């Protein structure tokens, strides 16, 4: 299963780890399907670290899960933040996942087993690079606003019904 984020900078295609992070993927896919992420800005952009989005309030403090509250972390020891393009739930402590997520710009081993890793970028690394190079203010907010315009969900024909 995969999705494509259509952003103001271009497309980013993400493969989802539905078997390893089923709850995070269910939440993410349902939010994508309901157009929840449409218009969400990339509100935090730290070169060589990560870019964060998924907050419809644009404050970096908002967002809800499909269950209306936080949901638990899903950690798999084999899944590591070991490269550019890891996609994880943002949180503010254990079991506080909602709607915000981030994409890494490089290996970030210190995030392992602290943030639910639920996917990886498989196409659109040029778009990710373009976003990474955008100038930011002192709070890491892009000076030129970048956002998710809409999302395409791609069905996996090999997946069981």
Swiss-Prot record:
GO terms for cellular component: catalytic step 2 spliceosome. Pfam families: Pro_isomerase. Residues 1-153 form the PPIase cyclophilin-type domain. It catalyses: [protein]-peptidylproline (omega=180) = [protein]-peptidylproline (omega=0). Coiled coil: none annotated. Transmembrane segments: none annotated. Its EC number is 5.2.1.8. This is Peptidyl-prolyl cis-trans isomerase 10. It comes from Caenorhabditis elegans.
């Amino acid at each position: 299963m995969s999705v494509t984020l259509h952003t103001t900078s271009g497309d980013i295609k993400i493969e989802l780890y539905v078997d390893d992070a089923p709850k995070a993927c269910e939440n993410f896919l349902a939010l994508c399907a309901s157009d929840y992420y449409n218009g969400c800005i990339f509100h935090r952009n730290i070169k060589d670290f990560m870019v964060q989005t998924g907050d419809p309030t644009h404050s970096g403090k908002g967002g809800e899960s499909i269950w209306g509250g936080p949901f638990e972390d899903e950690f798999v020891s084999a899944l590591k933040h070991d490269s550019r393009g890891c996609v994880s739930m943002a949180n503010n402590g254990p079991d506080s996942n909602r709607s915000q997520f981030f994409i890494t710009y490089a290996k970030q081993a210190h995030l392992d087993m602290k943030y639910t890793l639920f996917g990886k970028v498989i196409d659109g690394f040029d778009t990710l690079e373009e976003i990474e190079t955008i100038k930011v203010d002192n709070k890491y907010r892009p000076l030129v606003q970048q956002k998710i315009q809409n999302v395409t969900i791609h069905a996996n024909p090999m997946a069981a019904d």
